[in-house]
Amino acid sequence: MVNEDAKKVWAYIDEHEQEYIDLLKKYCAQPSVSAQNWGMREMAEMIRQTITELGGNGTLIETGGNPFVYGMIDNGAERTLTLYNHYDVVPPEPYEQWNTPPFEPTIIDGRLYARGSSDNKGSLLSRYIAVDAYQKVLGKLPINIKFVAEGEEEIGSPHLM
């Protein structure tokens, strides 16, 4: 059984579905191909901005490779949840195997097609959307949230350590 607060959050997400889809399209339209160093800093900056809009202190951390994005919503809670994601994608080649251009998000039969839509920009945004919806509906989270997003997972995370 779903509690009433959860129903309110889900209703908010449903009401703002197009806004969230548009944000996912924006993320997927931004290339972030780590193997080709294509669009990495721009994507990191987009994520930093989203964290800031959620009320966190988003910042880029230089690594010698692609930047890490770090942020925190500090609610003074005893517990902290860390959300790890990566923002890089694999190269889109070969292009001829795509039915639509990989960095032009397209909805077909209710599904969004674009490079990174499921690995990993959709996953990253689903967590951020949950934080956004909770805060808009219920106010302050009962926990602190740390956001960590790296830009080299698809090439073995050489600067993670």
Residue ranges and their predicted role:
Residues 2-115, 136-143:
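Acidic/His- and Gly-rich active-site-bordering loop/insert found
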Residues 120-161:
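Acidic/histidine-rich catalytic neighborhood of metal-dependent amide-processing enzymes
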